[in-house]
Amino acid sequence: MFFLVGILIFGYYTGSFSFSFVNNLQMADGAVPFIAADAAKAVAAGGFILPTALVLMFIGGAGKSAMFPLHIWLPDAMEGPTPVSALIHAATMVVAGVFQIARLFPLWIEYAGGHMSIVVWVGVFTAFYAAAVACAQTDIKRVLAFSTISQIAFMMVALGVCLPGHDGHIIDHHGSLGYMASMFHLFTHAMFKACLFLGAGCIIHAVHSNEMSAMGGLRKYMPITHATFLISCLAIAGIPFFSGFSSKDEIITACFAYSPVVGWIMTGVAAMTAFYMFRLYYGIFWGTENKELHAHHTPHEGPWTMTFPLIFLCLITVGVGIYTTLGGFLNWGGSFGSFVTANGTDYTIHFDLQIALTSTIIAIISICLATYIYKNDEQPIADKLYKTFPRLHRAAYKRFYMDEVYQYVTHKIIFRCISTPIAWFDRHVIDGTFDFIAWGSNEAGESIRPWQSGDVRHYAVWFITGAIALTLVLLAI
């Protein structure tokens, strides 16, 4: 609803629903006016109307991209087949909200720059929340689901921290860092997250369960899936020479340029990402093998139709990672900017060595921590942590009770406090009014029914009486 209202407001005040006029707002120096039709009206209203329309469309995009608190649909949507999740949840459908913000980004910078903080903090909170929930999940699909939410929030934050140009309006080459980082992470995330989802499908196919407790020790049964899953985990953790390294560090660099607070929060979320992904990795491929379950069905590698896509996606992940990592160190530049800007402006990706080293060291520490806790067959440290912080662990496992909050809001507030009075009003007032009209009509009919006796003599008497009465009235007048 918010998205539709935003579109209608946007179209009314701009005179078009097309993106083509947005592209006329060049994301570089010397920008042209963005309105082609009815320019005076739209520009005059731009101080309030256009930012309102953009924020409304952002709310719709936030629901599409599973931003908090509109995220609860995505984990349940993961019940579908993993190839579907790999295609529409990792690469296309769920990132549509981010892409919508990116397509309208010239307008955000020009007319709603003050509202960009909404995008930033919604994304920051969503990224942290989803990463915290992923650390406690035991269902492989749900770990990847909340990982997807967190990574999409990374993209949203990157758009929000994009800095305007020196004139305070149009984005310039320095301010393009967040925009470029967001679109580049959308590109790299599609590869390694699709590989993770397809790998999860191979694992579920092998053990017939989504639960990590049914897994463990699968590396000796599924070597290809093990290798590709490990590479994808390294990519999402942001390790150098894998595709996620450059895009993640670009986002963190843009965050530090916007605010050190945002930068450190997102660095912490990146560390949490490395931790929960390797918690998942060790829980599946290392740890204690479930011999009781495997006695009934020995795990096995999938056919080549299942493993070939994993290998293909991993090759792309590694290839892009090597190219972008070496490009960052050697300052190769590249043409990715012209690929993601509507007018072909070639923005280069900025590489900050200090931030890259810091985030990489933190990611490696997180991986080592996950290795120390979860690699061994026995996991006394993990058990001790669960027993030390049972309420925190349960809250994270229960998604911090967001489902219960929605249940309470819908049943106790919407249904009981809003829907019930409306139903009473409809049943007693609306229906009662029409029932009263029907009852009155029926009573009136019953009262005049004796007049229609079917006796001609009665009709003659009434006719003569009426004629006399009418004559007297006319004579009196």
Where are these regions (language model features)?
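Short, charged cytosolic
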Residues: 195-196, 425-438
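A short, ordered amphipathic alpha-helix with a cationic face
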Residues: 381-386, 407, 433-437
